Design a protein with these regions (language model features):
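Nucleic acid-binding interface residues in structured DNA/RNA-binding domains
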Residues: 1-103
């Protein structure tokens, strides 16, 4: 499960973000947003973990990490051109849409 989730995190392009729930759904685990978060905690540091954020609503996401990790996530996203307003990110502008899984 974790490897499949990480595979989808790798598909998020520079300058885009996806929510934990979107990653889980794309990987075939529609109720796996917590597992998606956990898979990032134990992942290779080269995985673009900073591109995965929490969901506020359909139009807005947010950085859930606190302290230095949250600051690092915001800095990495901003370096890729993502505008971070406090902890919030515009999903309409910066959200990645995964291709639908084959059935």
């Amino acid at each position: 499960m974790f490897e499949e989730l990480r595979r989808y995190v790798k598909k998020i392009p520079r300058g885009k973000v996806a929510t934990y729930g979107q990653v889980a759904l794309a990987a075939g685990f529609p109720t796996g947003s917590r597992q998606a978060a956990w898979s990032l905690k134990t992942a290779d540091p080269l995985l673009p973990w900073h591109r995965v954020i929490g969901k506020v609503n359909a139009k807005r996401g947010k950085i859930l990490l606190r302290g230095a990790n949250g600051v690092e996530q915001a800095q990495r996203l901003e370096a890729e051109g993502v505008i971070v307003n406090g902890i919030h990110i515009d999903l309409v502008r910066f959200g990645h849409v995964f291709k639908q899984r084959p059935t």
